[in-house]
């Protein structure tokens, strides 16, 4: 049995979900890694997104980001080549993010109810990577855009 390592990042708003997410994932045998950064009201979500994305890329694993809305974390995460982060609001989004778009990181609001957070996590982890030609073609087109214009291209 292969043990999946999940990298979890959370800012001062997401920290309220931290223990529940860790316990939930540990219950199913997943290894959860978190940054050695102390959360406070002045912390900056890009620091957590950076830590998670660097580890996801290095270890070919999955990442979960939690903040007030999930928006800032997803924007920061998508600056990394090789990261496909989706902001999700429910378990259907988590399924589509992984199965259609090949997401390796998800971001969501700390204000989502606990039961739905569990459903989101389940769908994200258990859903298979894209296999249909149309999804693979679209992911390749996204990758090509990055190569053609550069990730930080500004007009």
Protein language model features and the residues they cover:
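C-terminal binding/interaction regions
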Residues: 9, 13-15, 91-155
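N-terminal beta1-alpha1 ligand-phosphate binding loop
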Residues: 5-24
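Helix-adjacent hinge/juxtasegments
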Residues: 48-87
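A short beta-strand-loop structural module common to alpha/beta enzyme folds
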Residues: 31-43
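Short, conserved beta-strand edge motifs with alternating hydrophobic and charged residues
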Residues: 9, 33-36, 63-67
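Short, structured coil segments at secondary-structure junctions
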Residues: 28, 80-81, 101
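Short helix-loop-beta junction
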Residues: 23-32
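Short amphipathic alpha-helical segments
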Residues: 19-22, 75-79, 119
